[in-house]
């Protein structure tokens, strides 16, 4: 990775982040089973355009694990507390552009909805945008993988067998993943048990069939905020993608000032089309600056 991570103290824990360059902040927010590493081939396209910030969410990447974690750890509320405090610690407060993937969309949109005056714009890719009706809504077996991870066998297959990294992450990449990349994805979750808890907690919070109810409600509220905000938006569409379904497209059509680029990829197009994403993102950003 060409970027060196630094560490900040947040709520008594160490969080890792990349913080490079000067100017208005461009904040890259990752989701489940990944870290700031996922942006390694996209951020170079943004160099010279602003201050590039990419956090490792708490319990992920090189950020600390939570002490005494268990089934109720790494809930969205807890992740949000660390994310918000990290941005505050880094002095990210105005003219902010968010680049969000997966659950990074929830963390970023929540922050944006509470700091609308601070937002310059946001880009999103494969985020949790709407409540999906059922596991059967998903394509190509992805719903069945989610059903397995969220079922009674979830703790065993995720915490013991590292199912989310070995099966779900890899199932979201089209190319043959090289050993260097897989080693970095596996590294934060090498130890079986609670070290892998973030990957289980995240997947169990995906709103499917209205459950969990609190996440379903938050997802609806954040979509409503995006609908009401005139800030510039960029939809980075992965083709064929994995979690963006007809209901998501219908929702995105209601978001004003919303541009789109399409790149080749499944759930993690950053691994298949990083240069296409980077070039499209840079062109869009220059247009809103």
Language model features: what each stretch is:
Residues 13-65, 86, 251:
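Conserved HGGG/HGGXW glycine-rich cap/lid loop of the alpha/beta-hydrolase fold
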Residues 1-3, 13-15, 53, 60-99, ...:
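Flexible "cap/lid" subdomain of the alpha/beta-hydrolase fold that forms the substrate-access gate
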Residues 31, 272-273:
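Active-site helix-initiating loop/hinge in glycosyltransferases
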Residues 277:
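Histidine-centered active-site loop/cap adjacent to the catalytic His
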């Amino acid at each position: 990775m060409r970027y060196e991570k630094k560490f900040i103290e947040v709520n008594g824990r160490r969080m890792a982040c990349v913080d490079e360059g000067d100017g208005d902040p461009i904040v890259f927010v990752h989701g489940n089973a990944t870290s700031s590493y996922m942006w390694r081939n996209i951020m170079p396209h943004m160099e010279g355009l602003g201050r590039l910030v990419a956090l490792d969410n708490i319990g992920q990447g090189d950020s600390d694990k939570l002490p005494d974690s268990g089934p109720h750890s790494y809930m969205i509320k807890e992740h949000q507390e660390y994310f918000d405090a990290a941005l505050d610690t880094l002095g990210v407060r105005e003219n902010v552009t968010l680049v969000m993937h997966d659950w990074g969309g929830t963390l970023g949109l929540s922050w944006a909805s509470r700091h609308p005056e601070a937002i310059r714009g946001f880009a999103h890719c494969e985020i949790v945008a709407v409540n999906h009706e059922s596991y059967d809504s998903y394509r190509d077996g992805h719903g069945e993988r989610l059903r397995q991870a969220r079922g009674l066998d979830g703790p065993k297959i995720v915490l013991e067998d590292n199912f989310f990294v070995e099966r779900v992450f890899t199932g979201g990449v089209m190319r043959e993943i090289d050993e260097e990349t897989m080693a970095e994805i596996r590294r934060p979750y090498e130890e079986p048990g609670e070290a892998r808890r973030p990957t289980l907690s995240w997947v169990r919070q995906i709103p499917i069939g209205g459950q969990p109810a609190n996440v379903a409600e938050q997802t609806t509220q954040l979509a409503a905020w995006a609908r009401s905000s005139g800030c510039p938006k960029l939809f980075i569409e992965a083709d064929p993608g994995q979690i963006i379904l007809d209901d998501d497209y219908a929702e995105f059509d209601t978001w004003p000032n919303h541009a789109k680029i399409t790149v080749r990829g499944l759930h993690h197009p950053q691994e298949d089309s990083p240069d296409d994403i980077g070039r499209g993102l840079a062109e869009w950003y220059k247009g809103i600056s």
